[in-house]
């Protein structure tokens, strides 16, 4: 059994959201993800992993190519393998509990509009623009 106190594990950074892996269990990991107001994740996917977010406090919006949904305390969002998504935090600090599991945790980033320093890696370009 693994037990976590998400409030005590929370770490915030004014420059970028923080993803702190709390443990690796079986074929996945569990993470506390901490967001300052207005922070945005990269627009990304995990081709071989399912990613589940549970909102502990705060909230914002989760976006996919198909839709945008509110993320509120007590709510959860499940991204199947390969689904492009990004999280946009709302006006308050947020703490999300993330569970990822699958055969490979690799992340491919399509874009990161909120991070002007971000540059695509060769593997990101190859994944999104094959051939």
Describe the residue ranges of each PLM region.
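Glycine- and acidic-residue-biased ligand/ion/polar-headgroup-sensing regions
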Residues: 48-50, 54-60
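Ligand-binding loop in jelly-roll beta-barrel domains
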Residues: 61, 81-108
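Conserved short histidine dyad/triad with adjacent acidic residue
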Residues: 31-46
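A generic "binding-loop/recognition-motif" signal
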Residues: 37, 48-49, 67, 83-84, ...
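Short acidic-glycine-tyrosine-enriched beta hairpin
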Residues: 66-82
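A short, N-terminal "cap"/entry segment at the start of jelly-roll beta-barrel domains
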Residues: 1-29, 42, 109-131
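Conserved hydrophobic "DFG−1" position in protein kinase catalytic cores
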Residues: 32-34, 54, 89
């Amino acid at each position: 059994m693994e037990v976590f106190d998400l409030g005590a594990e929370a770490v915030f950074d004014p420059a970028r959201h923080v993803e702190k892996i709390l443990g690796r269990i079986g074929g996945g990991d569990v993470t506390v993800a901490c967001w300052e107001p207005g922070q945005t994740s990269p627009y990304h996917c995990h081709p071989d992993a399912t990613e589940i977010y549970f909102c502990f406090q705060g909230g914002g919006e989760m976006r996919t190519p198909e839709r945008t949904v509110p993320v509120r305390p007590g709510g959860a969002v499940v991204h199947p393998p390969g689904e492009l998504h990004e999280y946009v935090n709302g006006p308050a600090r947020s703490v999300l509990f993330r569970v990822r599991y699958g055969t490979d945790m690799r992340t491919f980033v399509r874009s990161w509009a909120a991070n002007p320093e971000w540059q695509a890696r060769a593997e990101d370009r190859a994944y999104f623009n094959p051939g």
